[in-house]
Amino acid sequence: MNRINFREIARELNISHTTVYRVINNAQCVSDATRVRVIDALNRHGCYRDARVKPQTVLLDFDENAASSYMRDLLNLLRNRLAGNPFRWIETTHKTGQAKFLLDCRDAQIAVFAPMADRKIYTQAKEINPDLFILNLLDDTVGDIAIATDDFQGGQLAARRLYECGHRTHLAVTVPAPEDGLQHSFSNRAKGFLAEMMFLAPNCRIERWEVPLRRTRNSLPQKLKHKRRPSAVFATGLYFAKKTAAACSASGLRIPEDISLLGFDKPDCTEPPCDSIVFNPEQIVSWAEFFIMNRPVIKNGAPVHLLLDMKLETHGSVKRLNPTP
């Protein structure tokens, strides 16, 4: 049997070869008229295809952690954006229902994680269904497409903000405790912060505060009781900003009069809102929508990593100790 050359078919129809691949992969973005033309051409060349668009099964998987409601909101927004397309949606949680998740992977075409930092799960899903297209949101460790924030850049922005406000002697940065296993994004934020601050103020003392995520008891008040406490705290995540603000309140410290607080992600997680390194979640959803509707041809299993720019949003929680030089 003769081998079919998709590029020749594309030239015959005066379209791009990418469009031919999209029709073969049942992509939703190809117009009905173009789809029929491509299917007819494929059938003439002996590659028999059905012109009807088949509904695709999409797994929406989110982790049950402190930010699960935030992740669910992102996935629901994505689902609403794609509501007019023939998708079948299934919600899964791979950590608490791994057996069911892997079973659902067999018949799914797309899996969207928010997030998935576990390479083992990724490998197992690909073993069960090699054609499964995996998008990973808010984490850039694994996935065919990984859409995340530029955490290192965010840490650098935090360091510049504190430096410009005169906090150059004694600072603290909060990160998860090692047993929590959520180190990647938080670690990159802390690394960016440390690297930039060491460049700007080499003699600055920076304490690394490990805060357990799975304990109800807040250990931060003990750190804030020291006579030589830091002048500012960079909280590398939503949870840490909340905990730090609560610890300051419990210790009788006022923000920013007694101590400054700089957060990451959502300024309104504290009352009143704190200065924060933020990103636009709409961008994550928009890019996820684009890649679902325009599935790329990925060769050799090489993943595509997309990092979103960060920006500073100020609300007056960082006290200015001296003017910027």
Residue map of PLM features:
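Short beta-strand segments enriched in small/hydrophobic residues
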Residues: T19-Y21, V53-A67, T169-E179
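An alpha-beta-alpha
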Residues: A158-L200, A302-K319
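Short beta-strand elements in bilobed, periplasmic/extracellular small-molecule ligand-binding domains
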Residues: R79-T93, H170-A172, A190-R215
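N-terminal helix-turn-helix DNA-binding module of bacterial transcription factors
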Residues: M1-K54
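Periplasmic-binding protein-like
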Residues: L59-D61, D107-P115, L171-P178, K227-F240, ...
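Flexible loop/turn connectors
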Residues: F6, P221-P325
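Alpha-helical recognition/docking segments in bacterial nutrient-uptake
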Residues: Q56-R160
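Hydrophobic alpha-helical segments within soluble ligand-binding/sensing domains
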Residues: I147-V173, R214-Q222, F279-I298
